[in-house]
Amino acid sequence: YNLIEQIAVIADGKKFVSALIVPNFEMLSQALKDLNIKYKNTADLIKHSQVIEYIGKQLQKFQKDLPDYEQIKKFTLLPSAFTIERNEITPSLKLRRKVIYANYSREIEAMYK
């Protein structure tokens, strides 16, 4: 899915599925050209309501064939990728979920409030 660079899906022990999403900022800025959104940096861009809405609609299209209980209900956009340096991914680019959950615990908790 070319709008998403990285995604960490959160579901274990939760009432619904959520996700931390790192957009593919190059593809996103191409897709949003028509919306004429002004932003300084990626942190600024991901807070924009039109960006969140756009990614949400794309996510819905992508998940349409999944059973309801498997669909991502809420998501948080992140301004930068998960990295090996922060120990969030392995050298083979697998997600280290425990580290990601710890590093983004505030963002995760906010999705379940």
Region roles according to the model:
Residues Y1-K113:
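AMP-binding adenylation
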